[in-house]
From Swiss-Prot:
One of its GO terms (cellular component) is myosin filament. PANTHER family: MYOSIN-BINDING PROTEIN H, TITIN. Residues 1-25, 87-104 have a biased composition (Low complexity). Skeletal muscle. Seems to be also expressed in the slow tonic ald muscle. Not detected in gizzard or heart. Residues 137-232, 333-428 form the Fibronectin type-III domain. Binds to myosin; probably involved in interaction with thick myofilaments in the A-band. It comes from Gallus gallus. Residues 1-138 are annotated as: Disordered. This is Myosin-binding protein H. It holds the Pfam family I-set. It comes from the Eukaryota. The gene is MYBPH. GO terms for biological process: cell adhesion; sarcomere organization. SMART domains: FN3, IG, IGc2.
Length: 537
């Protein structure tokens, strides 16, 4: 600190020089006394300074104006050349305030006090950061292979690694009967497979694995059973038959006899559980050999349904299989069967699914009817997948009852739901609605009149008009007010109310006024036209 404050003292020295001349002149006298002061300053600076402060105070008491010099003087003590100048201004300050004489020492030591405030913020404790959670336990620790002097382990990464990434794993072993765990690997590794070497043949060891990260170490994943160090020539493997890879269904009362082969050398240990619980030996019989296991239930009950787990283990090596066995029976009858509506020769029915489905999905419903006269039941619908239906083609005048069976994979329900009411199909006489007769009588009326025509001699021509009326009117053709009777030169026709007159090879004599007259009992009507026959050029 002495080296750092020296420049500051040098810079502030001029401020001290600006003080009155007598102060600067008398400075050399205490200088020899102050030269040894820097050495004690490093250890116990305050004591020597307080001892030398009073003599200069008495000498320079008259000039009180130098009270403003203490600040620069405080910064100058580290410099050995100018300490006298700094101490002289500090003396008057001490004279005017004898009580703060102890404060004078800090004034001389304003160089060291800055160290004290600098130390004050340092001790303030920073708020502790919340500790990060360590990784979770590694998953699915298992033995992959065992030889005469080694064990190969496999596992899966933990579900949670925390905010820090995973640094690796540590594998530890402990001899059976001991509690001392020893790390096998010196440094963490990231692989989820590890082979432990140099193990004694015939020895049993416990194995566990820990996950490590910057936030801490996880709880260990430990094998349930110790591993016997001996060579496994053939790893355990279950050869599950194809029909057992899906739900195995049996009916209530039937026997369940399953043979499941497996392999493994030396002979593996076989374990059966049901829904992760030990088997009920009063219901299930198990017989094991070195190559297969037999699962036998003499009389199956619905309570025997569930998921059975087969485990084949050699030391830590293990293979598992799950058998899903379902024992079913006939379902119960449908519920709440009722007649919803009866109209014409139709009936609408509704019901609810059975309370007991027999441990199997309901495939459909069978609906039957019975007429009051015969009393026999006849099936009208099979495998109806809905809980409602409409029955048609019932005989008018009969009274019908209805019942419904439910059906699953085991068969139809033993009993049926019978509708409380009956449906009576009433006789109804159909009377067509009478249509009022319409008066179609109408006098003749031409809807299309004749038009004047011009033709050339020797070229046949036609005259057309249309008429309506009821009864159908009689048509009379006339030429120049004279009725045309049966003349081969003229051909008259009427079809769908269209009247036509053909004049064959007309001559100038055939020119004139032609009239079409329609007559019926209600009246008559007529139209005229003019025909002009020209001579060819």
């Amino acid at each position: 600190m002495t080296g750092k404050t020296a420049p500051a003292a040098a810079k502030k020295a001029p401020a001290a020089k600006k003080a009155p001349a007598p102060a600067s002149k008398k400075a050399p006298e205490p200088a020899p006394k102050e030269k040894p002061a820097p050495t004690p300053k490093e250890g116990h600076a305050p004591t020597p300074k307080e001892e030398h402060a009073p003599p200069p105070k008495e000498e320079h008491a008259p000039p009180p104006k130098e009270e403003h010099a203490p600040a620069p003087a405080a910064e100058t003590p580290p410099a050995p050349e100018h300490p006298p100048d700094a101490e002289q201004p500090a003396a008057p300050a001490a004279e005017h305030a004898p009580t703060p004489t102890h404060e004078a020492a800090p004034a001389h030591e304003e160089g060291p006090p800055p160290a004290a405030p600098a130390e004050a913020p340092a001790p303030e404790p920073e708020p502790e950061k919340p500790k990060e959670e360590p990784p979770s336990v590694p998953l699915s620790l298992a033995v992959e292979e065992v030889t005469e002097n080694s064990v190969t382990l496999t596992w899966k990464a933990p579900e949670h690694t925390g905010k820090s990434s995973l640094d690796g794993y540590v594998v530890e072993i402990c001899k059976d009967g001991s509690t001392d765990w020893t790390a096998v690997n010196k440094e963490p590794f990231l692989s989820t497979r590890y082979k432990i070497h140099d193990l004694a043949s015939g020895e049993k060891v416990h194995v566990r694995v820990k996950a490590i990260s910057a936030s801490g170490t996880s709880d260990p994943a430990t094998l349930e059973q110790p591993v016997l160090i001996r060579e496994i020539t053939d790893l355990p493997r279950i050869r599950l038959p194809r029909q057992l890879r899906q739900v195995y269904v049996r009916h209530v009362g039937e026997a369940v006899n399953l043979l499941i082969p497996f392999q493994g050398k030396p002979q593996p240990q076989v374990t059966w559980t049901k829904d992760n619980q030990p088997l009920d030996t009063s219901r299930v019989n198990i017989r094991n050999t070195d190559k297969d296991t037999i699962f036998f239930i003499r009389t199956a009950q619905r309570s025997d349904s569930g998921k059975y787990q087969l485990s084949v283990r050699i030391n830590g090596a293990e293979d598992k299989a799950i058998l899903d066995i379902r024992v079913i029976e006939r379902p119960g009858p449908p519920q709440n069967l009722k007649l919803v509506d009866v109209w014409g020769f139709n009936v609408a029915l509704e019901w609810s699914p059975p309370a007991d489905n027999g441990n199997s999905e309901i495939k459909g419903y069978t609906v039957q009817k019975s007429d009051k006269k015969s009393g026999k039941w006849f099936t009208v619908l099979e495998r109806c997948t809905r809980t409602s239906c409409t029955i048609s083609d019932l005989i008018i005048g009969n009274t019908y009852s209805f019942r419904v069976f439910s059906e699953n994979a085991c068969g139809m329900s033993e009993t049926a739901a019978v509708a409380a009411g009956v449906a009576h199909i009433k006789k109804t006489v159909y009377q067509p609605q009478k249509i009022p007769e319409r008066d179609m009588m109408e006098p003749p009326k031409f809807t299309q009149p004749l038009t004047d025509r011009a033709t050339t001699r020797g070229y046949s021509t036609h005259l057309f008009c249309s008429v309506r009326g009821f009864p159908q009117p009689k048509i009379i053709w006339m030429k120049n007010k004279m009725e045309i009777r049966e003349d081969p030169k003229y051909i008259a026709m009427i079809e769908q109310g269209v009247c036509s007159l053909e004049i064959r090879k007309p001559s100038p004599f055939d020119a004139g006024v032609y009239t079409c007259k329609a007559v019926n009992p209600l009246g008559e009507a007529s139209v005229d036209c003019k025909l002009d026959v020209k001579m060819p050029k």
